[in-house]
From Swiss-Prot:
GO terms under biological process: translation
Cited function: One of the primary rRNA binding proteins, it binds directly to 16S rRNA central domain where it helps coordinate assembly of the platform of the 30S subunit.
Record protein name field: Small ribosomal subunit protein uS8c
GO cellular component: chloroplast; ribonucleoprotein complex; ribosome
Record keywords: Chloroplast, Plastid, Ribonucleoprotein, Ribosomal protein, RNA-binding, rRNA-binding
InterPro entries to which the protein is assigned, alphabetical: Ribosomal_uS8, Ribosomal_uS8_CS, Ribosomal_uS8_sf
Organism lineage: Eukaryota, Discoba, Euglenozoa, Euglenida, Spirocuta
SUPFAM superfamilies: Ribosomal protein S8
Subcellular location: Plastid, Chloroplast
Length: 140
């Protein structure tokens, strides 16, 4: 059985869905992906998400559950609220930062999502709580 990086998988699925202007995307249901979806919804990057009833039986007999993320677009040209998503810390190369060294993304328009001892949070919240952690990804 292979281990997959659920964060990279989630971000890649969102990125690919944005390229074809899909309204929704299914990602693997874990506590981590649900927390990331909550942050993206709260910050206005996605419209909503729901825990899907759909399950998938893989070839090795593992049942996977999914969450459905509804993507957000604006205007008649259907421009996405998400311009770019960049994964920073990877399983082979972890990246950590103190709250003092956190920089704003895209001039404050974007945000950094961190994994801290207090759970997942944005860079703004980490700075106000004076907590550093692992930089998961940038989004703007």
């Amino acid at each position: 059985m292979t281990n997959i990086d659920v964060i990279s998988d989630m971000l890649t699925r969102i990125r690919n869905s944005l390229l074809i202007k899909a309204r929704k995307v299914n990602v693997i249901n874990t506590k981590l992906t649900v927390n990331i979806a909550e942050i993206l919804k709260k910050e206005g990057f996605i419209d909503s998400f729901e825990l899907a009833d759909a399950t998938c039986l893989t070839e090795n007999g593992v049942i996977k559950k999914y969450i459905t993320i509804f993507l957000k677009y604006k205007g008649p040209k259907q421009v996405s609220y998400i311009t770019k998503i960049k994964r920073v810390s990877k399983p082979g190369l972890r990246t950590y930062s103190s709250y003092k060294r956190l920089q704003s993304v895209a001039g404050g328009v974007g945000l950094t999502v961190l994994s801290t001892s207090k759970g997942l949070m944005t860079d703004r919240l980490a700075r106000s709580n004076k907590i550093g952690g692992e930089i998961l990804f940038y989004i703007w």
